[in-house]
Amino acid sequence: MITHIMIEQYSFGNMVINGVSYRNDIKIIQGKVVSEWWRKRGHLVDIDDIQDILKSKPNILVLGKGSPGQMKSSEALRKFLKNNGIELIEEKTSHAFKTFNRLFHKGENVSAGFHLSC
């Protein structure tokens, strides 16, 4: 696992991680940034949209729902996470990136998906 990842800033449509600017939605899996994250149903995150995260078996999943918070997790995903003992934290991206940083630097097994726009 990478131990030095740091989300430095977020503004609508842009996230800076370790000095690199990302302008499309991203996932962070075991400390590795996966850029160009697209979901099958746009603002709805379902199990198929995060298979790579689920395979990494995180204890916590942080979802950044965008600036106004339009992105949501599906009921099927919420049930799956609960049944598999994975804590889900859904927040507007402006708060979620800070939550991720705090948990990651505490040594938690945390992964994330961030919607960078609406």
Model segments located where?
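Short acidic loop-to-helix transition motifs that present clustered carboxylates
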Residues: T93-K98
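A short, acidic, amphipathic alpha-helical segment used as a generic capping/interface helix at domain edges
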Residues: V45-K55
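Non-catalytic interface/targeting segments
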Residues: M1-D46, R102-C118
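Generic secondary-structure microfeatures
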Residues: I26-K32, K57, K65-S67
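Mid-chain, well-packed structural core segment of small domains
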Residues: P58-E91
